[in-house]
């Protein structure tokens, strides 16, 4: 037995052999203090303090946001698509430095799609290639090492190639097709707003306030959405990994954020 539930609802560490008992929150405060002091000197003092407070007060959070919840049956949604003979074709779009394409292909394969590897060079060589696909997903990673900014080098490669620009512009304008950008792919698409209908209020992605690359697990709650990708998933709380050096959104005003949500 490594632990028991307490009536007080506060996690405690008890070591009977040496008659030691302390709240976990107190021990975590001791454990996290040195990291906080180092971060305060190295990074942004405000973000360092914010993270420190979140850690030592984690036991006071609303429990709803600590436990992942599914408000839909995964098998119930995917079964009707997985059994189809003619699966929709999706392009797993990548560029030099992108590293999340294999996991993305596997995810879409499990969701009932027929996945195809597509590099930007393929579109440049054959602009008509995109006509074959029902959807396109721009994957995550570090295209061109993010030297020009997150996703910007990838976007510029498309912008400054007439054939690729026209091909993707046509694809984005087709109401019978869809595009998804994840991680670096999302940052890349935010730099192609000029050719994506309905993206006027999309944000820019700029450096994190901490001035550091942030890799964390967070919980997201899915609101009501018109997106087909979130169909029947309303109110679900899912754990996701965020890993960005430029993950802060920048918009003209708060109304732009609301208008950007589908």
What are these regions (language model features)?
Residues 1-89, 97:
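Intein/HINT protein-splicing elements and their conserved insertion hotspots or analogous self-processing inserts
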Residues 2, 127-128, 165, 169-170, ...:
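Amide-donor transfer/coupling interface in amidating biosynthetic enzymes
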Residues 1-21, 116-122, 202-212:
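Beta-strand->loop->alpha-helix junctions that form or flank phosphate-binding loops
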Residues 95, 140-142:
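Short glycine-/small-residue-rich Rossmann-like dinucleotide-binding loops
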Residues 87-89, 114, 239:
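Residues that mark the start of a beta-strand
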Residues 142-227:
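Cysteine-nucleophile active-site neighborhood
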Residues 102-117:
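Short helix-loop-beta junction
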């Amino acid at each position: 037995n490594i632990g028991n539930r307490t009536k007080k609802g506060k996690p405690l560490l008890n070591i009977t052999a040496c008659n030691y008992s302390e709240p976990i929150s107190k021990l975590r405060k001791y454990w996290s203090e040195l990291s906080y002091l180092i971060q305060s000197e190295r990074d942004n003092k405000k973000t360092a303090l914010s993270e420190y407070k979140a850690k030592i007060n984690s036991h006071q959070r609303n429990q709803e946001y600590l436990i992942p919840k599914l408000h839909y049956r995964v098998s119930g949604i995917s079964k009707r698509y997985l059994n189809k003979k003619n699966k929709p074709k999706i392009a797993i779009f990548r560029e030099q430095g992108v590293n999340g394409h294999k996991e993305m292909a596997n995810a879409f394969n499990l969701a009932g799609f027929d996945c195809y590897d597509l590099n930007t060079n393929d579109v440049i060589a054959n602009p008509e290639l995109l006509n074959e696909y029902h959807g396109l997903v721009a994957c995550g990673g570090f295209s061109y090492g993010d030297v020009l900014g997150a996703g910007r080098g990838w976007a510029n490669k498309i912008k400054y190639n007439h054939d690729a620009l026209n091909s993707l512009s046509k694809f984005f304008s087709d109401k019978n097709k869809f595009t998804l950008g994840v991680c670096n792919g999302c940052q890349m698409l935010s730099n192609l707003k000029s050719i994506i209908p309905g993206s006027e209020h999309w944000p820019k992605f700029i450096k994190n306030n901490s001035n550091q690359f942030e890799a964390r697990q967070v919980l997201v709650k899915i609101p009501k959405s018109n997106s087909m990708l979130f169909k029947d998933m309303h109110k679900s709380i899912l754990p996701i990994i965020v890993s960005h050096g430029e993950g802060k959104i920048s918009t003209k005003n708060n109304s732009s954020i609301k208008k950007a949500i589908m």
